[in-house]
């Protein structure tokens, strides 16, 4: 008798939010078994952390003994082009893509060893390492790369936030954030491929290179945007010294600190969320307001 597939708790919770996600989850056990057979992988238990909410991810070993990771992504707007991004960056500075099934959002990637997340290091060290990774990510794509413009993601967010208007706690703050979400993607100068979700939890210690990035969500747009996710993960420092924190990281990246601040404000004020009364985000938005 085949053992039931273990489903990480955060992924299970996410799949309860829509019928489409529930249908995806119902098909997942058969898909994982078929992929493991097709790619000759013996799987261990899946990762079950606070960050495994948008994919089923498990370490494994191939028939030749090589360590790998199988990832089957939950379909969502921001992560649609992850496989294309891994192909584009081709292992530098991302993990290597070994096999993929684009139609299933499934990928077999190299396993980082020891795999310790960068978040275990002091934040000032995180700043330097993430800045160096972003400099390597921001390379000019070839013609026909297929990555969507950043404006497509911010338009998606704007529509979701607008649909929640009756839940807003500060109409003026949200309206100002929405205005910037419409404006900033079209005023950033040279557009480059962006990771859009690069933070210290998505950077792992490895052997092939000291640090490798996982989970890219590529779009093309303003490089100043790519500063935001790491900064949002540095909440105590950002609350205590917002200007100093933003200026330091912007200087490491070589991007305009004012544009980073505007992106941070726009996201804190108007990015979609479950709780529009979140006091931490309201406080951050007010501290960074133009």
Regions flagged by a language model, labelled:
Residues 1-94, 206-210, 287-290:
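Conserved NTP-binding catalytic cores of kinases and kinase-like/nucleotidyltransferase enzymes
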Residues 2-6, 10, 116-172, 191, ...:
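A cross-family kinase active-site recognition segment
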Residues 16-19, 27, 163-164, 168, ...:
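ATP/Mg2+ or Mg2+-diphosphate-binding catalytic cores
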Residues 24-34, 142-196, 206, 251:
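An alpha-helical support segment within catalytic cores of ATP-dependent transferases
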Residues 26-29, 64-108, 112, 116-137, ...:
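A conserved alpha-helical element in kinase catalytic cores
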Residues 47, 51-62, 69-70, 97, ...:
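Active-site acidic catalytic loop and adjacent metal/ATP-binding pocket
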Residues 205-258:
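Active-site Asp-x-Gly
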Residues 263-264:
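Short alpha-helical scaffolding segments that buttress acidic/His motifs in well-ordered protein cores
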């Amino acid at each position: 008798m085949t053992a039931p597939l273990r489903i990480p708790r955060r992924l299970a919770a996410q799949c309860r939010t829509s019928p489409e996600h529930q249908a995806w989850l119902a098909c997942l056990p058969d898909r994982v078994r078929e992929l493991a057979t097709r790619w000759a992988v013996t799987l261990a238990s899946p990762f079950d952390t606070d960050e495994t909410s948008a994919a089923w991810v498990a370490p494994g070993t191939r028939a030749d003994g090589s360590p790998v990771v199988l990832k089957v992504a939950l379909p969502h707007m921001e992560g649609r082009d992850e496989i294309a991004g891994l192909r584009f960056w081709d292992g530098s500075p991302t993990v290597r893509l070994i096999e993929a099934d684009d139609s299933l959002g499934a990928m077999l990637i190299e396993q980082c060893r020891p795999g310790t997340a960068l978040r275990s290091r002091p934040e000032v060290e995180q700043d330097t390492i993430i800045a160096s990774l972003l400099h390597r990510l921001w390379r000019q794509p070839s013609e026909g790369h297929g990555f969507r413009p950043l404006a497509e993601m911010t338009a998606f967010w704007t529509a979701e936030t607008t649909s929640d208007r009756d839940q807003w706690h500060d109409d003026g703050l949200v309206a100002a954030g929405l205005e910037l979400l419409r404006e900033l993607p079209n005023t950033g100068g040279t557009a480059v491929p962006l990771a859009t979700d690069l933070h210290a939890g998505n950077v792992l210690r490895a052997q092939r290179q000291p640090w490798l990035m996982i989970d890219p969500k590529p779009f093309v747009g303003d490089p100043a945007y790519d500063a935001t996710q790491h900064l949002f993960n540095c909440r105590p420092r950002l609350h205590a010294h917002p200007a100093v924190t933003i200026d330091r990281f912007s200087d490491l990246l070589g991007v305009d600190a004012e544009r980073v601040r505007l992106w941070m404000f726009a996201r804190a004020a108007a990015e979609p969320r479950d709780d529009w009364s979140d006091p931490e985000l309201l406080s951050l938005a007010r501290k960074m307001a133009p």
